[in-house]
Amino acid sequence: MKMLQNKGPLQELTLNAMAPNGIFQDEPMIQKFENHYVFKKDMKSKRNKEVKNQMNDWLAYGYLCSVHEAKKWLEEETNNEYQNLDDFVDALVNGKVLCQLAFKYYPKLASNWKPRYQISERNTVYLNAFFHFLDFIGMFTPFRFETKDLVRRFNIPKVIYCLHALSYLLDFLEVTRHVPSLYGKLRIKKSQLNTATKEISLLKKAKKFPNFPKLKNFFCSYSHRHETATSNKQVSCFREVPAWIKQCQSQCRGFLTRKCVSIEKLRRDDMSERLGWLPKLETKLSSISDEERLILLKESHQIYRKMVSLHLELLHLPQLEMSLDFCGFSSDDSSIAISSQLVPPILNNLIFKLEESPQIWILIISRFSSDGIDKIDVQNFILLILKFFGFAISASDRRSFLNLIMSCVMVSIQQSSAEVGHSTSDSLISWASRLFTKGFCLQLQSFFEKHLGNVVDKFFLEHLCETTIESDAMRVVTEMLVSCYENRERIPNELPMVLKQIYYSRSESFKPSAIKEFIEYFLCDQLMNCLSVYYSKYFEGKDSKKFTLVKHFMNSLFGRVKLNEQTEIIWHTRNYRIVEALVRKLIHLSTPKIIPVYGGRTLSCTHKDIFDLQNILRYCDERGDFSSFPSFKKLISLLGSPKLFKKHENQILLLESKNEVIHSSLPCSKSSLYQLSLSLCIPLIEGHLRNSLEEILFGVPTELENQKFMSVLRNDKLIKSIHPGSLSGISNSFVNSKHPIEQWQSRLRKILHLFSGRNEDIASLQCVLQFGSSERIHLEDIQNSHRYLCSLKKNNSQKDIHRNPLLSHVFDTNTKSFDTLKTLNYKHAILKKSMGELYKMEMIHECPRQLFGQILVVYLNRERTLLNFYLIENSKTIDEATLQLTDLIQAIKTGIYYLRMFNLPFHVKQLYTWLAPISKYDSEISFNQKKERRKTFLSFERRGKNRKF
């Protein structure tokens, strides 16, 4: 009761809890509870605000540290100093600092960069140069910023983020070091933190603030120099080893050696007992009856199985001489049949041990040379021989081994000649081909000089089959050529000697000229089949590297042949036909796309690193110089791009008819295109590309540019390998001239002049480039050209036709077409070739023999708007100054809208159908039509090759 008299908080709680009907009677106590709950809620909200403020402060601190890091890194790279962060941001907005950084690591951009801007657009020009540098170095798109982010200051943290990523990327390329870490080393004022938090909060709401901590982890995962370093304490702990461990290890080694020696003795005794059964079996087989002989043969098979089971045990023996002893025991005092069954598995087991000790080969050579080679077949040594060439052995050991190989070849030829119905040509030639290819790679010239003639003579004396010998020998030669090209080596001097030994050993039975003619065509076919198989692996370069192989091959095959004056023309045409067939097959093969590798500390690229004109065209399109000149853009793309060349593979440019006549169909036109492409594209890549078309055609180059261009022409191997000797040799004229770039400009003006037919002024060239060869054709253009032709009919008279002898001849032979011919002015002949020559040139794929004497004449009017072609029954001499049908097709592409046909028989209409689709424009032809046309073209090509004259 005394406790209840003193009223306290506990007593109030008890009384309220004991109140009837659950009604609280003390109201001030309820207010206390409510106030306490509100107080706790306020405390939690205050704590959350404090935590958020601290997190925002730390985030702002990290951002400001990253800004200071970028500022310090740029100061070290550009040698500039900034007092405050505001000055640093103003310098970034100006863009000059970023442009200096781009010029430092991309000097090629600095040589080509010429500012043409107003005062208001200065910062955008600087930023464009910086963006070109980012494209060149391969910056990832998530790390890049836009111009408005920096110029209008929408997102400056994104710019700092890009600078950090650039530093890490340059560090990955081993050019500079990345930004230094200043986190925790700087002291920043509260006012700076508040301003930074406001900027960050706005960007976070828009989800545009970059994540700086993840940047370092991203680049460190891709970095090849990221290594985990161990501390010195851990290394010292590993080096210190207790003394009792060494004693335990020595005891274990002793126990294992004693155990191995005991096992080795047991195995050796067991093997000697089993090997002793072989001579006993052979003696019993020769002395007993037939029934007992069958029983002993079954026992011998069981013994042989037990011996094969011992081969696995041989692999685990520490001494390799035991396997050689086993091989020697099997060959001594035993028949050839048993030794031929036992030796191959033994040699297969030896191969596993050769990688550890190549000196075992000396033991093998000495053992088999002492035992004799008569008992062993050559085929058992094929795996060992191929394995041998992979080791580095002294020259004396290699000579002894090669002598053993040649003796084995001689013995195998003698054995095959003694046996009836036994053909070893396939196995021997396949084995010899592998040996020859490896021998060429090892440069074994003395080996070929000493032994090859004897082997080939004996082989031809014993085997008289023509087809197998020639086909196998061709396979040998093709494997030699492919192996040489695979190892990036020149074709050896022994190749003509091999051909002479193979094909001129039987000069008594066959004529040398017939054999030689068969060699050439068959060798070309075999070589191209082999190249088509190995193409995806070994042809990693561009199209010009394909011609180097053909050039080396032709020099080695025909360079040393001495010919008389009478047969010189025949050999020249024959060589040309072979080169044409080779290059035609090479052109149709697909080239893999090469990813350029950027090397060097300054990250500067030359024409050897990048030979892609698509980048140049993209560069021109960005500047807007060639947007109004589509044909000039198409001209460059036709010359340099191998992808676009597939569409126009039957077309070449119009060249001068006096000096640069091409007497071939597709291959030489391909080489002339590459000749022109080098003369056009190398100055563009080397930095001579001007800002406008007027400066490209008529700009005056400096002396430094001329010297640089001359050094490129002298040192570049691509130009020397591509230019054939039959053409005029533009590369030599460029190198010898004092002003090569001006010569290049004049050549470009001539090409454009051939398109236009006008004077060399800028206005006419611009008119031609804009309207003369446009890819878009409309009905209005056709109607206008037709009206223009109608006006020409009134002005021209019959005298103009009779002045030209060709037109007068046409008038006499073809009176029906006079009404149409007299109205047009045919200034010169585009083509005048016989149908037989067109068939040989593979321009016409199916043509009857009755039309071979007729001549196809093609004429064009002055304005290049109408084309007429017809046949003449006359076999006059052909003027070499006339251009080809491929040039005609290119002329059709440049602006001819009509095709007419006069006096053509019914079965020659496929010539018209073959010409007409090419004269159309690419926009009118669908993709399926191109596919079908390509199939028909390939089928015609195969039929033309199979047909003989």
From Swiss-Prot:
The GO cellular component terms are: nucleus; prospore membrane; prospore membrane spindle pole body attachment site
| Family matches, as InterPro entries | CH_dom, CH_dom_sf
This protein's superkingdom? Eukaryota
Q: Which Pfam families match?
A: CH
Instruction: Keyword check for Nucleus, yes or no.
Output: yes
Q: What residue stretch is flagged as signal peptide? A: none
The record's keywords, sorted A to Z, are:
Nucleus
| Listed GO MF terms | actin filament binding; calcium ion binding; calmodulin binding; GTPase activator activity
Q: What is its main location?
A: nucleus
Keyword tRNA-binding carried by entry: no
Q: Where in the cell is it found?
A: Nucleus
Q: Which GO terms describe its biological process?
A: ascospore-type prospore membrane formation
Which parts of the sequence belong to the Calponin-homology (CH) domain? Answer: 64-170
Q: What is this protein called?
A: Uncharacterized protein C17D1.07c
Species of provenance: Schizosaccharomyces pombe (strain 972 / ATCC 24843)
